[in-house]
């Protein structure tokens, strides 16, 4: 038993961690004493080393073999994806960055780190820790330090001026247009030094983008519409930029050019300065009546600055608006002042196709807006700051005179300064009640400016007809009773050919009991353009409407000289800002969806069919223009709730076509009953007894409804529809899609065509809700 206890004791002592060095035995001591003197230094060194506890380092752990696996656990599985990097400052070492990373992901998650080329390279144990570091960043010395991944680095893009309530998914489409997203978007803290305020975020966010080849840096801005307000977001890959000197690396507060030089030399006294006196000291000891404590006081006297000396650099900093006004004044006083553009009068006639032209010059004019201050603006700097309180670049009442008159009124900052005359459209001809130019009735607030209902831009703030502004929206002041003449005039010769746009001849007038005025449809618009005609529903039209409601004057054939039609016209002036063009595409969809009268005015219905639709009348006949190929008026249609034109739904058109006999007999319940239309219809389940619409007639109906020519592939697909036994279900589903798509732009109807093409190829119908709602 005793031997076993000693043996177990030895094993326990050997297996346990020694707290200190073991004492040498007597035999070992005698062995050291018997060694020669030449080895005594080595022996003493080894003995001293034996008495010192070795440092607990990774090398010592590996050399002694004391559990090295615990230190190297997870190192073998590391890849480049586990590494992150960040910039290092000269005041902090690598350990400070390791501690900062450990505070974010935990001390055990940090595996390796090093300083390379002025950057801290840190490897984390898991990819989750890497993503956390990239999204949150680290804080070193009270300053926020962004962290980038090593794998697929891309370029760090910083977004500024981003309100905290804007969600990230609203920014991703704009960022994807710049490059490939390599990381999620993260919010950048404000960097408060107070520990209780470190959670406060700034208006900046960061994201990793893989830019196109050959592009290292990007800088610009884009607009994000949100709840009726357009927010301008700035993005940049460079360092912080000074707005004073436009250089990188510092802000305006620390700009060298903005610092006041306090060590400037004192100028010599001026001969004309009577208050000059020699520099020296004034002693208070010789003065009477002065306290003894002040007798030894000496006041330093310096030469005062002459009145003709230059002010300090800080007083020389003038606003950009003042500088622009000075330049504008010089340009006005010089000989190189551009002449005002000529005004183009655009007529409308019933006998010919009206043509819209533009004033002389193709370039988009620059007009004074609520944010425009400079050579092209009549606003002073103080006025501009007040106008910037508006959420958009709309003209305010004081600025209407700058748009409609020959020049802008004198600005408050500079007497006599005027802006160049903008493009003004004068609607001439016989008038109702007055004969005054449009400018006399143009000084109206923006909320009273009419919309261009032709193009469906119903909700674009205050209006969308006429002039382009910095926001890309074109509008004219409301002309209360100004009328367009019903006589034929040619377009001015100076109008460029590429700017002339022919309006489809669906503008009709009739002497029916109920008012009838068909808005021109199918006008092809380029990106950013806004052109068309819009009827003005004015109470002065006594012959239209009920109880004094607005309408359009009914005109008989041959009465063009006495009666006029109220209408507004817009010029094809396009916006050149790519951001505006991109925003308009999405904004039109949103605004149409929010419009109250979207069901009748936003849908480009079938031009040939709708133009021939007339209200039921037993006492009068509708007078239509002489258009080749126009079908006979359809009977049996009731006037819809819209005041613009009747028969706005495709279902009513199909119903009228069935009653007229163009299609085979289809019951009204099968055609119009939406309750039986399912979200998904399987074409494979067919009813052979269902009547089939001829493919050629269906093709014409689709082409006329959409107002566009179908592709050849689509023609071929439609020709095969007669082989499908369930054509009627497809037509019913198509009607539902059209009804759902009333709020979309013209490009959305091309999506509907692709939608049907996909239905034919896969022999199934997609859900209506799956149709994209943004362009």
UniProtKB/Swiss-Prot annotation:
Keyword flag Lyase:
no
* Compositional bias per record (Polar residues), positions renumbered to this chain: 35-46
Q: Which UniProt keywords apply?
A: Transposable element
Name the residue ranges with Basic and acidic residues bias.
1-10, 539-549
Q: Where is this region: Disordered?
A: 1-46, 256-277, 535-565
- Record-given protein name: Transposon TX1 uncharacterized 82 kDa protein
What's the source species for this entry? Xenopus laevis (African clawed frog)
